[in-house]
């Protein structure tokens, strides 16, 4: 069995642990001399290990897609699918989000509200990765097979370059009301920058990579991972900007990002495939091109 790891323990775990410790050591002024307290603490530790390693989700089984999820026609240019909408002509997808973080270190631009990646995501949404993935399939979005992770030699130095098939290019836009009350639409990449170089993620820098399924677990659904600024194979979408393989570089631009809980609409827009230089080209069957 392949474990589906969570990179950090879930936030709810820390809340439970804090309440437990307050009850044991503050309210009751007790110590671990009491055998019952030892049992309680042992249970907390076991749950901690399970949740942080992925065992918790293994016990629960794979996250299931929403039942009876069918597109409903609103007009010639809009269909509803669960909590999202899409345009069959432009193949654009849009859904409601809210500002979840506007100051802290980020690994994701968008996550759903139900999973463990929420504390490191710029935006959150009630729309699930399943809903988005189904809409993308209906609209014939083709995921890229470009390589997400670098290979390293024994000394830790990267080997070669990431290979790319040129597919899956997309833009992620945010639409919201500005301070003057007027509607603004701009790339979500304008809200996040590399703290060292000060360069923003920018426009048109996203790739639909489609997540992975391991032992029946759709990783995007297990983690709620929709769009990652720190590359992750479980995310539906990734950016490949310089530094996107480093989880300590990406922060919101506080002067750009609206206040916490501000409601925004996220728009996924497909872009044309791009031509990739031969040195970086990944041929369609997933093998690396050789001369």
Which ranges hold each PLM region?
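Basic polycationic patches enriched in arginine
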Residues: 8-10, 18
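Long, low-hydrophobicity ectodomains and other hydrophilic envelope-associated domains
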Residues: 62-291
């Amino acid at each position: 069995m392949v474990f589906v790891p969570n990179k950090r323990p879930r936030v709810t775990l820390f809340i439970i642990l804090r309440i437990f410790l307050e009850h044991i050591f503050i309210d009751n002024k007790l110590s671990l001399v009491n055998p019952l307290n030892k049992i309680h603490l042992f249970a907390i530790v076991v749950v901690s290990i399970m949740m942080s390693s992925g065992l918790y989700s293994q016990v629960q089984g794979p996250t299931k897609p929403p039942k009876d999820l069918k597109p409903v026609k609103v007009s010639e240019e809009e269909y509803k699918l669960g909590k999202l909408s899409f345009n069959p002509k432009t193949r654009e997808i849009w859904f409601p989000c809210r500002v979840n973080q506007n100051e802290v270190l980020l690994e994701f631009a968008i996550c759903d509200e139900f999973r463990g990646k929420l504390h490191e995501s710029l935006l959150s949404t009630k729309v699930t990765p399943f809903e988005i993935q189904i809409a993308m399939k209906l609209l014939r979005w083709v995921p890229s097979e470009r390589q997400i992770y670098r290979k390293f030699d024994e000394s830790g130095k990267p080997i070669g370059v990431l290979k790319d098939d040129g597919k899956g290019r997309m833009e992620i836009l945010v639409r919201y009301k500005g301070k003057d009350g007027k509607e603004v639409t701009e790339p979500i990449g304008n809200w996040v920058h590399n703290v060292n170089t000060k360069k923003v993620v920018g426009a048109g820098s996203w790739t639909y990579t489609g997540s992975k399924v391991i032992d029946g677990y759709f990783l995007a659904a297990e983690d709620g991972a929709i769009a990652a600024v720190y590359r992750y194979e479980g995310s539906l979408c990734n950016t490949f900007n310089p530094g996107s393989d480093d989880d300590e570089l990406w922060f919101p631009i506080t002067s750009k990002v609206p206040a916490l809980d501000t409601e925004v609409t996220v728009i996924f827009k497909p872009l044309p495939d791009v031509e990739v230089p031969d040195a970086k080209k990944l041929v369609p069957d997933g093998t690396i091109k050789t001369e």
